Each structure stands twice: as structure tokens, then as C-alpha cells.
């Protein structure tokens, strides 16, 4: 008798729930959240849209750093949410505002109990920036499972892209001691989308939720 995993969570079901500037404005701290973070212009919004198969879910902009609030998206399974964190890096805003964003981001990462995992987006052409490393340090301090998506992989040929992936994996292993892995990703070719789904499934789907012989699926919600 075969055992197959249910998928009660449909990532296509993601719908905007609310925005918050500060931790105390976030939804009640119950349920499960997987957050998306990344340097400004790394392709975070495009990655979130590709993963949910909804090109309009997270607003994309040619101006780096336009994501200024913590944006919450609800899924079709009660208490399950995706979270789009403010882009960090070189946003063209006053320094005081950048520090405010950084402080709010840090408080969310350190104190949000429902945060179960993080997807950290990096441009494959500029991985492991000082900002990325700071983010990984925060994740390590909390022992937060993290998936690094090397976005815009379609901008490189396959050979150089794989080489960069191996180099990033090596550096992650050498510098950090917590559950972190890396994956090539392209919102254009959809490389890495299934791997991102599998990573999130670990937190949204209880390991004992199996069914015999026939897998049960849900129709994606429009």
C-alpha cells in the first residue's frame, strides 16, 4: 500500500490579507508563516508571484526598495500565510527611514512566533552581499530554516549558474551553522518553483498527513 502526501495548501490560493509597518500591527501571532526577504531589486516580488502563479500578487517595481511594509498573504488552509518583507539595501529613501525599515524587519524576524521558515532571495549575479549575510546571521541566531533562492538564473548560462550555486553552497556551509540550503531560481523559466513549494510544504503540511493509494488534490482557487 503506497503512502502519498496530501497537499491541503494551494499556493495559487494566496490572497492579500493586510499590511503592517510594525510588529504590533501584524495579524494575531498564531498559525504558520513562511516569509520572503531579499535585497532591493533582487527579484523578491517576481519570485513570490512565480511561486504562487499569480503575476499580480506582489507588486513589482523598477524602483528598488518600494516594498516598505510587511505584507501578509493568506492561503486556503487556516492559519497559513506567506509574508513579503521589506526589501533591504539601497532604496532611494532617507537614511532614517532605512534604519526604521531595518529595525522593523529585525523585530519581526526575532519575535514573530509563527515565523517557521524564510526564503531569502539573492540575485545570482550578486549573491551574499553584506545585507544578505546580516539576514543569515539573524536566521542563525534563531535557528530558522532558510532557503536561498538565487534568482535571475536565466541571466547566466547553465554552466556559470551551476558554478555560482556550488560556490554559494560552499560558503553557506563554511560560515553558518543552521538549516540553510540554496537553489537556482528563475521567475521567467520557472526553474526552482517546485523546489520552493517542496521547502514550504515541510512547514505547512504536517508530516503525518498521508493518505493511502490515491493522492487527494484540490482545484486551484481563481
UniProtKB/Swiss-Prot annotation:
Biological processes annotated in GO: division septum assembly
Entries under SUPFAM superfamilies matching the protein: P-loop containing nucleoside triphosphate hydrolases
InterPro entries: G_ENGB_dom, GTP-bd, GTP-bd_ribosome_bio_YsxC, P-loop_NTPase
Signal peptide feature range: none
Domain EngB-type G: residue ranges: 30-206
Binding site for GTP: 38-45, 65-69, 84-87, 151-154, 184-187
Keywords from the named record: Cell cycle, Cell division, GTP-binding, Magnesium, Metal-binding, Nucleotide-binding, Septation
Function of the protein: Necessary for normal cell division and for the maintenance of normal septation.
Name under which the protein is recorded: Probable GTP-binding protein EngB
Species of origin: Hahella chejuensis (strain KCTC 2396)
Amino acid at each position: 500500500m503506497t503512502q502519498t502526501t496530501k497537499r491541503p495548501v494551494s499556493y495559487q490560493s494566496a490572497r492579500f490579507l493586510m499590511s503592517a509597518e510594525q510588529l504590533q500591527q501584524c495579524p494575531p501571532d498564531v498559525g504558520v508563516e513562511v516569509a520572503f526577504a531579499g535585497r532591493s531589486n533582487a527579484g523578491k516580488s517576481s519570485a513570490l508571484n512565480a511561486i504562487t502563479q499569480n503575476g499580480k500578487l506582489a507588486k513589482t517595481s523598477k524602483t528598488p526598495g518600494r516594498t516598505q511594509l510587511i505584507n501578509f498573504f493568506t492561503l486556503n488552509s487556516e492559519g497559513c500565510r506567506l509574508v513579503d518583507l521589506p526589501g533591504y539595501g539601497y532604496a532611494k529613501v532617507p537614511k532614517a527611514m532605512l534604519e526604521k525599515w531595518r529595525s522593523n524587519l529585525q523585530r519581526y524576524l526575532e519575535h514573530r512566533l509563527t515565523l517557521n521558515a524564510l526564503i531569502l532571495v539573492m540575485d545570482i549575479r550578486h549573491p551574499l552581499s553584506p545585507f544578505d549575510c546580516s539576514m543569515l546571521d539573524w536566521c542563525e541566531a534563531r535557528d530558522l530554516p532558510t532557503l536561498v533562492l538565487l534568482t535571475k538564473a536565466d541571466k547566466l548560462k547553465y554552466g556559470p549558474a551551476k558554478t555560482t550555486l556550488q560556490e554559494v553552497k560552499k560558503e553557506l556551509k563554511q560560515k553558518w551553522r543552521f538549516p540553510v540550503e540554496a537553489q537556482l531560481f528563475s521567475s521567467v523559466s520557472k526553474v526552482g518553483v517546485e523546489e520552493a513549494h517542496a521547502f514550504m510544504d515541510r512547514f505547512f503540511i504536517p508530516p503525518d498527513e498521508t493518505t493511502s493509494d490515491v493522492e487527494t488534490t484540490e482545484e486551484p482557487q481563481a
